[in-house]
């Protein structure tokens, strides 16, 4: 059983106090990470065998019949018909028991007991990895739930179902729902949790700037251990902020952040945050040869094997190389290509290729004098750039005002 699952055994409590947690931490997101690793072509076969064995033990322990069928389909494993039938029978028995409790509560007890039963059914579908039935049970549970805090917890559980299957439509739908409920009276603790949920979602859809702001807000008051460990929160915070923030903000919000530095200095469990610390320091301190080494190491050892970051690791790596080149070139009017290549610890041909690509797409404001082997940097006129930005933003604002006026006058 994973750590998240061990924490999820407590039953819902309903005494009219809506501050108590009523939804367990199912579905267990560690299981979906294991499923991702088993699908990854670069994971060693012996590692896959060990992970698959552990996953099957968890599936059997919790009678996860729907998830078992998904896993078998993923890895082309022959379905054990006897085991599947036994798990389905156990699932049906449990659902029948809960349904009977709900029916009895409707006849003989009150709304509180009915709500308890519906919550248990919803939680059970989450536990066994049955997305479709969890969504149906959510509707019934939500309609019977009257406390604002309780309703938000049910919505959080549906966001986790979306994260479990990386169903972005489902995640976005219920994050929007959670925000609407927060505006109606969500408490401080749940607002903090929502930041972590939304940050993880934004990172998974490549919105690193949006994720960075939310992760930074979540760091001092983090409590969403059903989503990730605190160590992973620090990893994601460093990864997104180095990509999204400029140097002054990176220094203020990350380099000087006590909570972040405490974790980075400690190195994390088994030293897993040491490369993250070296990555951040080498980038900020302009040790570009070390930065390239650390970026490549994180890419090959962490990003590729993280189900949220894996689809974006090439995009992230290109973006960070661009930021490093821009940071390097900023103080210069001209600089030799071979000097830049030496500072980055790569060949001149590599730097030449990279710069040509970025110049051609307008991402770097410079030109290459191939005859003399020199890069000529064209620094933007900040006033002219600001003037153009004001004109552009003013046009957008004017268009919106005109649209609003048409709506009001209609």
Curated annotation (Swiss-Prot):
Coiled coil: none annotated. It comes from the Eukaryota. Keywords: Proteasome. This is 26S proteasome non-ATPase regulatory subunit 6. It comes from Caenorhabditis elegans. Belongs to the proteasome subunit S10 family. InterPro entries: PCI_dom, Rpn7/CSN1, Rpn7_N, RPN7_PSMD6_C, WH_DNA-bd_sf. Expressed in multiple tissues including the intestine, pharynx and hypodermis. GO terms for cellular component: proteasome regulatory particle. The gene is rpn-7. Acts as a regulatory subunit of the 26S proteasome which is involved in the ATP-dependent degradation of ubiquitinated proteins. Residues 207-382 form the PCI domain. Signal peptide: none annotated. The keyword RNA-binding does not apply. The keyword NAD does not apply.
